């Protein structure tokens, strides 16, 4: 059975249904010239868990990855995506739709049935650049508890786009009334705040949108800490230290955060009205399980960089925050990624004068 394929470096198009029903195909290696992935090209490829869209890919055909095994999808703003591209990807757990940088970039809509039947997808953030959500876009996403909308004005919404989902839609507090005034959106469960109950004194949080922690119902806002920008990953297998933690009441998108509060207390937070730009230099560098690391140095050892998709995981061992698994290059070779996984950790400096945190509870 076909498990791995290395396509020619000069290949520009993967034809319609080229690898359809290749049920054992797990790895696809292609060059930097590929522009088009045809209709149904990887349909029914259940073993294909990961597929990284390189910068050259501009067109993704209808049903391109329908019923594939993808678990994580990072899209690009300059892509045109056909209908039902990821339909029935039942293992899909994370989707990144980037904000487009200008009006000429075509990723401004969620196409018809694009994620329909993705039953494991728990949340998604739609950037302000999304102006249309088409029919059945998320129909049947039974686990979709959080749909985060960053646009100030309601997008054009097909009435069945969120059928057979929890229909929980979160918007900016200042824009809630605008969404309530739109009949299509008002038929959903519109909300402007989230709640988080802490089971231990310290916890972690990951969001791919700016977050503001607010006082509500007589409770103070929980305390959040982010790492200083001096932290840098140089060797993925080495333990690094966060030398200083900064206390904040808002966090920028894609930042790992440590929360402090009272156990068994419910705290409130919401989408920030403006990006938390003041925190741009307070980056910590943990990663989500499906994140790819990119090697930038010819020595094959140092200066790995991360895609903007991070996640902290607390361990039972006090004062250690494990970052989960990160997929790295085995060789510093163009077009090669994701071959090996490693675990690495961050340690908190336990000096209260610099961190404000004495211990971390699992």
Where does each model-flagged region fall?
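A structural signal for leucine-rich repeat
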Residues: 87, 160-164, 183
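Structural signature of tandem-repeat unit edges
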Residues: 1-13, 23-36, 46-59, 68-80, ...
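Extracellular/lumenal glycan-associated surfaces
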Residues: 20, 135-140, 256-261
């Amino acid at each position: 059975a076909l498990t791995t394929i290395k396509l020619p470096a000069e290949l520009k198009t993967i034809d319609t249904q080229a690898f359809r029903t290749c049920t054992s195909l797990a790895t696809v290696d292609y060059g930097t010239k590929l522009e088009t992935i045809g209709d149904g090209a990887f349909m029914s490829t259940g073993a294909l868990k990961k597929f990284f869209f390189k910068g050259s890919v501009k067109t993704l055909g209808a049903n391109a990855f329908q019923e594939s095994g993808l678990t994580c999808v990072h899209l690009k703003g300059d892509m045109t995506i056909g209908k039902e591209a990821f339909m029935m990807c039942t293992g899909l757990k994370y989707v990144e739709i980037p904000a487009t940088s200008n009006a000429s970039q075509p990723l401004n809509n969620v196409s018809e049935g694009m994620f329909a039947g993705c039953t494991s997808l728990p949340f998604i953030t739609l950037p302000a650049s999304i102006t249309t959500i088409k029919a059945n876009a998320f129909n049947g996403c039974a686990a979709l508890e959080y749909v985060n909308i960053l646009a100030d004005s309601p997008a054009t919404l097909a009435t069945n786009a969120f059928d057979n989902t929890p229909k929980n839609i979160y918007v900016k507090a200042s824009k809630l009334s605008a969404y309530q005034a739109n009949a299509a959106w008002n038929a959903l469960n519109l909300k402007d705040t989230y709640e988080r109950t802490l089971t231990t004194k310290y916890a972690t949080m990951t969001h791919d949108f700016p977050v503001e922690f607010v006082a509500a119902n007589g409770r103070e806002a929980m305390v959040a800490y982010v790492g200083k920008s001096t932290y840098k990953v140089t060797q993925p297998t080495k333990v690094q230290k966060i030398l200083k933690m900064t206390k904040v009441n808002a966090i920028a998108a894609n930042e790992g955060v440590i929360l402090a509060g009272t156990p068994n207390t419910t705290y409130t937070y919401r989408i920030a009205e403006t990006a938390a730009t003041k925190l741009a230099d307070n980056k910590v560098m943990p990663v989500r399980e499906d994140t790819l690391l990119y090697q930038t140095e010819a020595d094959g050892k140092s200066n790995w960089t991360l895609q903007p998709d991070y996640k902290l995981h607390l361990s039972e061992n006090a004062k250690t925050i494990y970052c989960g698994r990160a997929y790295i290059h085995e060789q510093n070779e163009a077009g090669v990624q994701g071959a090996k996984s490693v675990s690495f950790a961050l340690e908190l400096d336990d000096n209260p004068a610099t961190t404000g945190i004495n211990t971390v509870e699992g």
